[in-house]
């Protein structure tokens, strides 16, 4: 599910290239309102760098939980603020000073690269996000640090 038809087109091409059209379903829509998806009907959901863009994270997670079959898996890859002070400082310098300049020059959209670090800083800590997953009903919640804590992979089971 994605709001962007362009992102879905990219996904379709990749799915076709791998011959997975019969196994993967794509829908244009809002992850916080999955009314087009039946309850207990999905085997797995993956989200890469998208949960922090939800307007209401709890609502989005609840919808994902509703659509997953019992035993279904959720895997989320999301940015995070590193816990180590030195790494956090280096990351913040890069994200707030260098990234908007370089990204703005390449894409001509500096605002998008200003939004990115702000949204990362506002995203819940790994502990808090894990608690949010449990609060909507997920079990076997795991959070694994990647790249010195700049990103995390979260796994959860319905």
Annotated model-derived regions:
Residues 130, 136-158:
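Core SAM-dependent methyltransferase catalytic element
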Residues 32-45:
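A short acidic, Gly/Pro-enriched loop at the edge of an enzyme's catalytic core
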Residues 27, 46, 75:
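Conserved Rossmann-like nucleotide-binding pocket used by diverse enzymes
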Residues 58-73:
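A short glycine-rich, Lys/Arg-flanked "PGG" loop and its adjoining helix->strand segment in the class I
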Residues 43-57, 80:
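A short SAM/SAH-binding and catalytic strip from SAM-dependent methyltransferases
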Residues 77-136, 142:
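C-terminal alpha-helical "lid/dimerization" subdomain adjacent to the S-adenosyl-L-methionine
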Residues 21-24, 40-41, 71, 140-141:
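Short acidic capping loops at alpha-helix termini that bridge into adjacent secondary structure
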Residues 1-34:
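Class I SAM-dependent methyltransferase SAM/SAH-binding core
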């Amino acid at each position: 599910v994605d709001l962007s038809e362009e992102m879905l087109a990219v996904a379709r091409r990749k799915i076709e290239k791998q011959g997975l059209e019969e196994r993967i379903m794509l829908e244009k829509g809002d992850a916080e309102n999955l009314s087009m998806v039946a309850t207990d009907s999905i085997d797995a959901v993956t989200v890469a760098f998208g949960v922090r863009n939800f307007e209401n994270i709890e609502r989005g997670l609840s919808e994902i939980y509703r659509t997953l079959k019992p035993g279904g898996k959720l895997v989320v890859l999301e940015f995070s603020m590193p816990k180590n002070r030195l790494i956090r400082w280096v990351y913040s310098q890069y994200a707030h000073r260098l990234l908007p300049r370089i990204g703005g020059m390449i894409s001509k959209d500096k605002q998008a690269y200003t939004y990115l670090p702000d949204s990362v800083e506002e995203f819940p800590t790994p502990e808090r996000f894990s608690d949010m997953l449990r609060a909507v009903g997920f079990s076997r919640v795991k959070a694994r640090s990647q790249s010195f804590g700049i990103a995390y992979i979260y796994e959860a089971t319905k």
